A protein has these predicted regions:
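Non-catalytic alpha-helical scaffolds and adjoining flexible linkers that form interface surfaces
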Residues: 1-20, 25-199
Length: 199
């Protein structure tokens, strides 16, 4: 099975000395895992930052086994925020949420678009407020249409950090009690780290 697509890097883990297993959310195929040979080399690893947009060629001899990615960089979003700890942590947290909450090999145009929108939100002055609604929109796309928006809107009319943190906590509590725990999923550490960068 061979195909080409474009997608956002959700995660990467070392496979062996020279290779990585990467997980991407692609435009046409949804969430896909594959091995990147040479993924630890200086040439490639610099643009294998979580959140970056990549062109990918996928090759697999057997549908039941993990395939191989050949990748090229399309947009290096993440390096723009190397000097902004909060936004960098936000990207990692958002990509991890998508990794945890989406099913393998199920395309979803709305998820793909919402990932693209994340990088537009990060350019805004009130990015944190908009990010809270980004998380709500993500949950809504995944079938969790919460009336939580009513509470969050009231909570964050004032653009101060305390109320924004309360908004994030409210969404996090819902995520934990309604989605993660019933499915035996752990609360993502990356989201806790993101919240800690804001305090």
């Amino acid at each position: 099975m061979n195909w080409s697509d474009e997608g956002f890097l959700l995660s990467k883990t070392r496979f062996n000395e020279n290779s990585l297993i990467a997980e991407l959310f692609t435009k046409d195929k949804g969430k896909i895992s594959g091995i990147i040979f040479g993924g630890t080399s200086k040439k490639i690893k610099n643009y294998l930052q979580v959140g970056n947009k990549l062109h990918v060629n996928y090759n697999s001899k057997n549908e039941n086994r993990i395939g191989y990615f050949k990748i090229e960089i399309l947009n290096a979003y993440t390096p723009l925020y190397f000097d902004h700890k909060q936004k960098l942590s936000c990207i990692t947290s958002a990509m991890n949420l998508i990794k945890i909450l989406t099913a393998e090999s199920q395309s979803n145009d709305k998820i793909y678009l919402i990932i693209q929108n994340l990088f537009l939100i990060l350019k805004e002055k009130d990015w944190l407020k908009k990010y809270i609604f980004w998380e709500l929109e993500l949950l809504k796309i995944l079938g969790y249409d919460l009336a939580l928006e009513n509470f969050v809107e009231k909570d964050i009319e004032v653009n101060d950090l305390g109320t924004l943190l309360n908004g994030l906590k409210l969404v996090g509590d819902y995520l934990d009690k309604t989605i993660l725990r019933p499915n035996n999923l752990n609360y993502p550490n990356s989201r806790l780290l993101f919240l800690n960068t804001l305090k």
